[in-house]
Regions:
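Glycine-rich phosphate/pyrophosphate-binding beta-alpha loops
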Residues: 151, 155, 207-221, 289
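Catalytic core of DAGKc-family lipid kinases
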Residues: 30, 77-204
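Short acidic/glycine-rich loop or secondary-structure boundary segments that cap or lie
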Residues: 155-158, 200-202, 213-217, 241-245
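A generic structural signal for short beta-strands and their flanking turns/coil linkers
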Residues: 186-188, 202-204, 227-232, 271-273
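ATP/nucleoside-binding phosphotransfer catalytic cores, i.e., glycine-rich phosphate-binding loops
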Residues: 194-195, 225-226, 235-315
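ATP/NTP phosphate-donor binding region
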Residues: 1-63, 70, 74, 315
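Active-site loop ensemble at the mouth of alpha/beta enzyme cores that anchors a bound cofactor
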Residues: 220-228
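Short amphipathic alpha-helical segments
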Residues: 17-19, 73-76, 103-105, 219-220
Length: 315
């Protein structure tokens, strides 16, 4: 079959287009038969992947970063669910700044190395998270699938602030957004229900993880495993700005000492979660804002669902 490569020319801080030739050269050197298209706007990757599946291309290869992977993955899943068939295999090529999904799956993060994995044709399935949320009216619903994590509260709040700081780039932009977000000290009262318990009370953040690493350096769900058939939900209430600033560096630790060890932070294993928040909260999935304001959110696990081209011992 012919592979469809969906390349995001804006990936890696607008350097994706410069790497098109390297991608094509690597794939040709490995004897891959492929057709390459480029995204032209946000969410275009989802439409291109959906049409590629409908037109019989396989595998579907996303060349970009985590936002690109998420768009393409959602197009694959939508096509599979519409036709009630197995999802088409997904291949990953690293053109982004962080490429968290590839790091989480222990895949090579150079173009030639990743191309060799795709050409080898070995498949392993991972779990996917599903998030369903409603707008404030409760009438309009949005469903999204994620491979890394999704969150409400402080995490997407910082993402929104970062998007509005258009005059800065790189890590200093995220640092400033974080400081502004913490200074505002946002808090939410939530009702959180899951298979095995519930919680009603204040929170600073809620994150639901399928993989441990997100945002390049943050382990928001440090014990999440994309092969275990469950999601990791982490919630916590940290009331003061000083305490938040003390806890935040611990989100960058992958092992002992991570923020989930803080007494105000709780980590649970779930197959589903339902959340109601007051006031409304922003919501992101794999780093992309889905709602700037929502109050009702549901999470579900799709175990052993998405086939990804990787070595059999990639875990």
């Amino acid at each position: 079959m012919t592979a469809k490569i969906i390349l995001n020319p804006y990936a890696g801080r607008w350097k994706g287009l410069q790497k098109r030739g390297e991608v094509e050269e690597a794939m040709k050197s490995l004897g891959m038969d492929f057709d390459l298209v480029m995204t032209e706007s946000p969410h275009h990757g989802t439409d291109l992947a959906y049409q590629a599946v409908k037109n019989g291309f396989s595998p579907i290869i996303s060349a970009g970063g985590d936002g690109s992977y998420s768009e393409v993955m959602n197009g694959i899943v939508l096509a599979a669910q519409e036709s009630q068939t197995e999802p088409t295999p997904l291949g990953l090529l690293p053109l982004g700044t962080a490429n968290d999904l590839m790091v989480n799956l222990h895949l090579p993060t150079d173009i030639l190395g990743a191309s060799k994995v795709i050409a080898a044709g070995q498949i392993r399935r991972i779990d996917l998270g599903e998030v369903i949320a409603w707008d404030i009216s409760g009438k309009n619903q949005k469903k999204r699938y994620f491979a890394n994590n999704s969150a409400i509260g402080l995490e997407p709040n910082v993402t929104l602030i970062q998007q509005r700081i258009s005059w800065l780039r790189g890590s200093i932009r995220y640092l400033l957004a974080t400081l502004i977000g913490v200074a505002k000290n946002p808090q939410w009262k939530i009702h959180l229900e899951w298979d095995g318990g519930d919680y009603t009370g204040p929170v600073t953040l809620v994150t639901v993880g399928n993989n441990p690493l997100t945002g390049g350096v943050f382990y928001m769900a440090p014990h999440a495993d994309p092969y275990d058939g469950i999601l990791d939900c982490v919630y916590g209430f940290i009331p003061s700005r000083i305490q938040i600033l003390q806890v935040l560096p611990r989100t960058m630790k992958s092992g002992a000492g991570n923020y989930v060890d803080h007494p105000s932070v709780h980590e649970i294993k779930v197959s589903w979660v339902k959340i109601h928040t007051d006031p409304p909260t922003p919501l992101h999935a794999d780093g992309e804002i889905q709602f700037e304001s929502t109050q009702d959110i549901e999470y579900h696990i799709l175990p052993d669902y998405l086939p990804i081209l990787m070595y059999g011992d990639a875990k």
